[in-house]
Amino acid sequence: MEAYDICKFWKLDMLEEFSQIVLKGKKKIILDIPSPSQQNKSDIVSLCPADSPETCNSSIPDWLVKVMRKENGYDPKLIIKRRVLCTTDLRKNQGCLSMHLSKLEKSDFLTEDETRFLDEDFLKAKRDGLKVFLVDPESDKHVVYLKKWNGNTVWKYVLSHGWNNVIDKKIFKVNDVIEIWSFRDGSGKLCFALSSPTRCGRSSSGHSS
């Protein structure tokens, strides 16, 4: 009888120890579930391409993160950090926004196929351009055409056709300063995004959520 009691108490001790192990395991599982704020940070990191850590190290503005989430976007690249808009940029008879190759912060935003297309398109008498999307500071998306151009021995990319729709919104004024970014939407399509303009050291409102 005494041996039986000892065995019974030993089994109870083992059962209690096992229960503690299970309880600790459950607590660990609960602690390992990321909070909403942690999930948001994770989402932001996932916007950066694994093969371009330098992009992740640079500061991705909040407005661009919102735009990219809306488009399931990824691979953000700062194309031009400080683009001062001039009179010709806002003239509808010009109908394009230019980006001088010498002013580009990043020149690897095009795929090999896109680069080849633009090079071949440049040789045509009438250039078709590469169909891309442009997101303005009010988060409206426009269809525009990216072309390669050589004017006065200066190589540049231009966003044409749909640019006049942006002009019509009267978001920009002469001497406004903007940033130009690129990214890929969920289908891999090339997109450009424009920051809200800065005027006299102040940023105008834009990029609604």
UniProtKB/Swiss-Prot annotation:
Record's superkingdom? Eukaryota
Which InterPro entries does its entry note?
At2g31720-like, B3_DNA-bd, DNA-bd_pseudobarrel_sf
One function term, GO molecular function aspect: DNA binding
What keywords does the record list, in alphabetical order?
A: DNA-binding, Nucleus, Transcription, Transcription regulation
The residue ranges marked as DNA-binding region are 101-198
Give TM segment ranges: none
Q: Where in the cell is it found?
A: Nucleus
- Give me the Gene Ontology terms describing cellular component: nucleus
From the Swiss-Prot or TrEMBL record, give the protein name. B3 domain-containing protein At2g31420
* Organism, as annotated: Arabidopsis thaliana (Mouse-ear cress)
